């Protein structure tokens, strides 16, 4: 068995210590705010299988840094809007925590849904299929 310098769980813990985490009930109340953009970073198959938060924008985890960087040929204009609050989510909150920590390192302000889509659904958040 290999020995890692830092485990994935430790990386998530470190990320969570430096990022803004939003609880499900709070994001439910923010859904209708036009200044809030919910970004789903799950794999497209997860979205198709489990559904998605209405109005969320899908951005695959592997492309986030490139879609946000205005100098990247892959840049998406949705990430260039001033005054918007971007809230990222995945299934459990691990990938989105790491994503938001990386984006903060890039100078991009964002938050993440603390417990992810699985808790969103359990706590009564609306889901589209």
What are these language model-derived features?
Residues 1-36, 44-85, 94-129:
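Rhodanese-like catalytic fold shared by cysteine-dependent sulfurtransferases
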Residues 39:
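Active-site flanking residues adjacent to catalytic metal/cofactor-binding acidic residues
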Residues 89:
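Short, surface-exposed ligand- or partner-binding patches at beta-edge/loop junctions that are enriched
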């Amino acid at each position: 068995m290999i020995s890692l310098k830092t485990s994935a769980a430790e990386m998530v813990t470190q990320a969570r210590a430096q990022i803004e985490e939003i609880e499900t009930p709070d994001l439910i109340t923010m859904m209708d705010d036009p200044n809030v953009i919910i970004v789903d970073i799950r794999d497209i198959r997860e979205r198709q299988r489990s559904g998605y938060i209405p109005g969320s924008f899908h951005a695959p985890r592997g492309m986030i840094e490139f879609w946000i960087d205005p100098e990247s040929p892959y840049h998406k204009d949705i990430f260039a809007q001033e005054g918007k609050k971007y809230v990222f989510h995945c299934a459990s909150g691990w990938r989105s925590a790491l994503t938001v920590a990386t984006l903060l390192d890039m100078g991009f302000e964002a938050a993440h849904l603390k417990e992810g889509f699985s808790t969103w659904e359990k706590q009564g958040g609306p889901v589209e299929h």
